[in-house]
């Protein structure tokens, strides 16, 4: 099924007139993207999800039949997010330490997620916005080569994970009083979500974070 989704990704990208580079950049190489889109190469669930999200599409509604390992990885992330919602620093750090057991730590999307989790764990313990900002910016750089403000202006495609990181970064900047041009950049981000996240399922994932 994962391989079939690669072909679907190709068809969707072609229909939208998007180049491979704009979708794959920072997540996987162009050569690997070609193999995925031909159905001849499998990548993990979260990496594939990020590629679809950069097209504004959701793989959730496809009711994807995942393997036992992929289900365990998805469940593990859900447990991580629950620990954050419960503000349980000790549990979160335990879960971060075990993250690589379920995911490929060489993939940029997982490096980014893990880096963001460490930044969040640090914030939960110290409530230090400057440290959190630094950590989140480093996490975002795992997939975005340019500063996020410049990326928005250049029409960079973004996955859900990148959008959430940008929102946390914006929040930290606001708390630190560094608000020059911030509202304009956030308006650009909101406009991007409205125009490029065409699947309602993906919009629903992002809107609660926007409200927060």
Question: PLM features: what roles do these ranges have?
Answer:
Residues 16-35:
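Short alpha-helical DNA-recognition segment
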Residues 75-102:
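Alpha-helical segment of the N-proximal tetratricopeptide repeat
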Residues 8, 74, 78-81, 110-121, ...:
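"A position-specific structural signal for the A-helix of alpha-solenoid helical repeats
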Residues 1-15:
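A short, Lys/Arg-rich alpha-helix, primarily the initiator
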Residues 70, 108-111, 153-162, 201-205:
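Residue signature of alpha-solenoid helical repeat architecture, marking inter-repeat boundaries
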Residues 93-104, 137-150, 184-198:
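Amphipathic alpha-helical segments of tetratricopeptide repeats
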Residues 46-62:
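DNA major-groove recognition helix of helix-turn-helix/homeodomain DNA-binding modules
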Residues 80-89, 120-135, 169-183:
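Short coil/turn connectors between adjacent alpha-helices in alpha-solenoid helical repeat scaffolds
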